[in-house]
Amino acid sequence: DSFSRMKVEKKSDGVTEIDDVLLIETQGETAQALAIRLARPVVVVDKMAGKVVTIAAAAVNPDSATRKAIYYLQQQGKTVLQIADYPGMLIWRTVAMIINEALDALQKGVASEQDIDTAMRLGVNYPYGPLAWGAQLGWQRILRLLENLQHHYGEERYRPCSLLRQRALLESGYES
């Protein structure tokens, strides 16, 4: 079929170009906002390790842009669910909130970092404890996502805790 000849190029971490379509991992912005700002078709993908990914396409995209993204992700062995185009999407938004809450509990002395991770991994059957997850996913990315959600919705629940800000700052210092 026509999709088998797509030109795919990894532009950077979290950004893949499929012909004229940008497939961008969520940082909290909508596909529509990105498509308008970048003046090209954008599909935002919300994925972690695992077989399921959710995508949101900009309303200004041609239908073929979304079909290309779905085809590409399916070729990677992913099950693709298309959801509404909202900031933070679904998976990342939820995980970022859990990580932020775990950092808040750590900061307030509720439990040690190891105990929080063990309790959530064994008690809720998460693949990782939220603090180990945060370190793996990147504190800066989680901070950026929560800041985008707070900016968009104006809700206090998305406010990043100060320990997240500290860890993101430390992480940025190690990357320079």
Give the label of every model feature segment.
Residues 1-89, 93-97, 101-176:
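NAD(P)-dependent Rossmann-like dehydrogenase/reductase catalytic/cofactor-binding core
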